[in-house]
Amino acid sequence: MTQVIVRNSLDKPFGKLANDAEVPLAVKTEDYSSVINYVYSNLLPFGTFREELMATPPSRVLSTFIQMRKHIKKSIIQSSAHTAIMVESERDPVFRQALLETSPQKIVYKSNNKFMGVGEDGTGDNIYGAALEQVRNELQAEKDRDAHQEAVYLAYIAEVNLKKALRKHNLEKYISKDRKRSIKRLVDALVQDYGKTQVFDNSPDIDTIMTLHEKRNIMVYTDPNALIRIVRKNTIRAVLAKNLLELRVAALNAFVDYAISKNVVRSEDKSRLKDQLFDIELGKRNDFSKRILDLFEAKALPDEIKNVIKKFKAQWYFPRDDEIEHFERETVKIPVPQATTTQQATAEPAETYTVSYDSDSVLSPLRRTQALNLNMLLFPTISHFIAFEVNKKYELTSIRGLYDTIKKIPIRTLDAWSKTHEQQTMEQRKLLLLEEAITHKLMDYSVKHLVWAIRDLKFEDKYNPDETTQIYRKYMDKINLRIQKIPSFEEFVEKDPMVHEVVREKVDFYFTILDNLMVHTKYKFNFKVSYDDLVKMSPFHGFILMDSVQISRLPIPDYLQWKNSRYGLSTESLVQIWTIVYNGLKQSEKLVGINDWDIRYKSCFIWAKYLLGQEIRSRRLNVMESRREDEVLLAILSVLFKLKEVNLRFGLSALNFQDLQTALYLCLGRVRQYVPKGNKPDLRPPPTLVADSMFDQPDIQLAPLVEPEEEVDETQVEIYEPEQMDDQEYNEYDYYRDYDEEFEGFNLNARKKFGIFFHEFYAPLENKIQLPELEDAINSFIKSSVPRSVKNQNLNFFITNFRVPDI
């Protein structure tokens, strides 16, 4: 046989060999839907991205892989840069200080590398500059956090001790006019007056105070004068009340001690009498203490009692009413909460700080100082560490060997080396995965049979065509399928999986014709037509039936029964459809001989499908400007000739635009949508039916036939820089395009004969199809996204046994 060329996965039947063809692969415990799903998902690290790519439709694997790969690579560089900068800032105080001094400016790494820096045009990702900013903000936040904790701690200590000190004096001594005043200086003054033990040791530790701060948000004052005034304003009356209470208690104790000492000698009796005194009701004791103080003011108490009261009043502060009023009227400036480092970072920086590519720059990733210790490895620069982390995920041999190589790479060649090394290692790994995937794919019997049926194979698709061709050729001679006789043709049809697929295709194609005829009758006729009527009068039976007709002894397949659930056909119609399909299969017997139903018989199906997808070999017309246009015109004329019978059955007298539309959809193998007047079309595509066996109930898998998406070419991608697409990127549409040159339509001579031809060939019907409409239909067919091989199969089907008109 001739060399088979595989151009895309939709070509029948050898498109199944394409790397993006959906042939399930079960490898260990994982399932892949195609070869490229296996290859590209295993090029990614284990995780969510890999699982997502495994489940991605093959048509979107490459574009999705490029996006994921870019994201993963960018994440690795960001993470590596952040780690290296943080370690460098902890190791080198000069680096740390230089980084902190850039705040709050935006840091820009001026490098031609558009991934690490901003590039020559300033549009790069600036990952290194952003990493510097992030580490700077983290360091500043840590510094601010420590300062904030200290401020909260000192504010709490100062407030607590000021409240204690207010009981002894009015705190005026701590009011300062010094511009350098601070809470820290206020606490130092309190320590000087009361001692460190009294100020700090009797207070909670900093962790307890921060816990209290989280619960009640301790106000952090930066101005000690404001704190002093707010303490006096809020607590002066409470201080007075507490001091007065303790004064009354002290006066009462002094009076009782004096009275008892005058009348009682024994100490035991003194203690008992004093205890009895405090058993008196509180209200009466308060009244008694007030009278004692009144006597003190009147200077009517003994000197012993007066001295005790004077000493107490000298130790504690008893503010006057005018002082209280003054303190409560004082204006206090409440501190405004300071913006956090995160809030400051979100604001638009007013200026930009530029880090140069020069290795002499302190913040440059190429700066050589002491070796950078990261993950127990020493790297000359930050850039060497980033290059190591990026290349590590593709390394096929030794990670240690990669490290030994990278640390010796000169700075000036590091970027170019990294790009080349990543691309080479990824290509090597991809080829290994490709061979693994194809090896697993060849375990599928139907794939093995396709390869067995041909002598030579070549790939011209977009997924490593040269390497794929070499791998298949490597295995072609090793495939040996035993020729085993099959007892009967019926058993062959019933049990062979490959024949099931052929039957399903024939059934689906028949119902495509049926659906288009139904839409056609709805558009052209005003009365209702049933699907059974269309089966009985279908004008395309002559294209399907050949010379002899045999009634199958097999039951109607469950697939056909299930397909009928949408149509409601009678048993008679189903028998007719199954007879048509069955006899189509029987025609192959003429090629291999009756009773030779073996693997060679199935090869006839394969080659029949393949040859139907090749160029049309029948006698051509000479009315269009290109051979391809003539082929399409011939098929449309053939379909219109059969539609003439439909029109005559229903008593219509003309062929019009509706007939032309039906012919176009039939040639494309698509179902035309019926849109009632005033309604919008239902754009939902019909489901594709999938069954494991022709005689089993199939499962419904929604796999709509849609226009192919624009695909992205896999290009040589740099290690640090984002993927740049080639100027002439791959467009999947080119694989579906069906033209040899620009569409030109009818030649001048044919235009003159067109009307005469239609009048004679389609008589007695009147022709209302205009020449531009016919040209538009041919042009639409040629530019359709349906694969060329599928178009050829449809054209060959409709041209079979058609009498080529003489135009």
UniProtKB/Swiss-Prot annotation:
SUPFAM superfamilies: YbiA-like. InterPro entries: YbiA-like_sf (IPR037238). Belongs to the IIV-6 155L family. This is Uncharacterized protein 113L. It comes from Invertebrate iridescent virus 3 (IIV-3).
